Amino acid sequence: MRSTRLISIYPGILITGFSILDFQKSKIKLIAYGVIKPKKKDRIEKRLLHLHDEILSIIKKFDPSVMAIEDSFYGKNVKSTVILGQARSVMMLAGAKLNLDIFQFAPRKIKQSLCGNGSASKEQVQFMVSSILKLESLPTPIDITDAMAVGICFVNNYNTI
């Protein structure tokens, strides 16, 4: 049986974390990870283009068949929520262009899947990611382990999707 490769994304307009994971049933192997950081001084449309182009490049390099991305949370700042939605959209568009199956997970679902508690802290999520992927040290910034958590959530829910 062949393993499935996925790109998992923790979206942000300033820092986007990503990871590439291979999995077969419940066995997960970390292939690569990193961050995409558009320039803060750039206008929003340039940052969105940068996110799109970088995700497209990563997908072409690693050839995943699935994208798992964290869904937007609904905060008090409407403008921030809209901008995050735009960032998510351009990354999902990159995946759609290359025919990836795209799955979205709410933050609470990700925490529930990894920690058994939808209100788990960032530290609890990091601990579980580190344990599951057998990381020697936690990558920084935290956006990377958040992206890994999205991918693990997909794997944990793969047979029910």
Q: How would you name each of these model-derived features?
A:
Residues 1-161:
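Phosphate- and other anionic-substrate recognition elements at nucleic-acid/protein interfaces
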